[in-house]
A protein has these predicted regions:
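Interaction interfaces in information-processing and related assembly proteins
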Residues: 1-123
Length: 123
């Protein structure tokens, strides 16, 4: 999403406020693909669900807000209710409902046994 920004100073922020144990998260990205983010409560350990990281269980119910600051007077802001708690599915839903753009988003995280991230990626 950040790579879709046109100007070097454009910024994208995604905020999720949720009822799950992580409490929410914030991610920012620029047009060059630089991304940083944090979760409100990082020390949450959930058991795997079907052998995979249980992102939906960590988030629970909530709201996702996408803010695009393109240097205009006011930033563009779109908001959707989390549908599944799986971030890729919720971003796909956001694109369809808020921006009316048919899209598919895929994300993956490979975890180490000590609950640290080994690698992550997406499209």
């Amino acid at each position: 999403m950040g790579s879709m920004m046109k100007n070097d100073t454009d910024m994208l922020t995604i905020q999720i406020k949720c009822s799950g144990p992580i409490g929410g998260l914030t991610v920012t990205a620029d047009s060059k693909g630089n991304v940083k983010g944090y979760v409100h409560e990082p020390n949450v350990i959930l058991p795997p669900k079907n052998g995979k990281l249980d992102v939906g269980g960590a988030l629970g119910q909530g709201v996702m807000t996408v803010i695009k600051d393109m240097g205009l007077k006011e930033p563009y802001s779109g908001q959707t209710i989390l549908q599944t708690g799986e971030i890729a599915e919720d971003l796909t839903y956001y694109f369809a409902t808020s921006e009316q753009v048919p899209s598919s988003v895929g994300l993956g995280v490979l975890m180490e046994k000590d609950n640290t991230v080994r690698c992550a990626g997406g499209f």
